[in-house]
Amino acid sequence: MPRIFFSCPLMAFAVFLMSINLGQARSFNNDFETGDLTDWKMDDTENNAFEFQPTWGDNPTARNRGQPSKHQGDWWIGTYEKYQGPIKGKKLKQKPGGTQGDGPQGQITSIKFTIVGATMNFLIGGGNHPWKDEPMPCCGNLKIDGKVVLTATGNATETMTREEWDVAKYKGKTAQIEVLDKHSGGWGHPNFDDIHQADARGKNIPWDRILTVDARGKLAATWAQMKKYY
């Protein structure tokens, strides 16, 4: 029987390809469609605003608010809301249209990922309490090296609209998204959903192809794989 020999370079290349394929299987819960806060870390604020997040469905419409959420999919962040759907919500004795109000505070921070796109876009609504202008903000922030470099707020309506950040100058940097609810007064809540990176043509880049850092801190792909987006 003939023997088959594998050279060290060939074996190394095979392992490299396997690592890419395994990495590509790792995506990011950018739209909260897991129905929980997978890939996001909640801070230790007592009575945390994000304890019953994400919320399910158009909960503002369920309570006749007159301001549809216009969320993507089924799940989204809305810290005024307290309804987690027909399965989990029912177990917790929650009802459609249920709320927790503006009182609770807290924040969530995403896993780390690498900026590879020209822009980032996302849905945001809720309160208009900016990061820099108020001591108690309700907003979404982009953080690089632990510092806020871009921020956005809602416009005092439950209805979310798609906003965009220019992130071209941050390409190659490791970043995180944080959603803050630090306000307990009027419109003291953020609504947030469906965040993406997009290339220079405005086409969203699949998260499983981005240089994300997974929960174990390993790079999920190689820089060479992203060249087509530049």
How should these model regions be labeled?
Residues 32, 119-126, 175-181:
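Extracellular beta-strand-rich recognition modules
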Residues 23-27:
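Boundary at the C-terminal end of the N-terminal hydrophobic targeting segment
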Residues 9-19:
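Bacterial N-terminal signal peptides
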Residues 77, 82-119, 161-164:
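Short beta-strands within extracellular/lumenal beta-sheet-rich domains
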Residues 139-175, 180-190:
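Extracellular carbohydrate recognition and processing domains
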Residues 104, 183-207, 220:
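Extracellular carbohydrate recognition
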Residues 116, 123-137, 184-187:
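Extended, low-complexity, turn-rich repeat/linker tracts enriched in Gly/Pro/Ser/Thr and Asp/Glu
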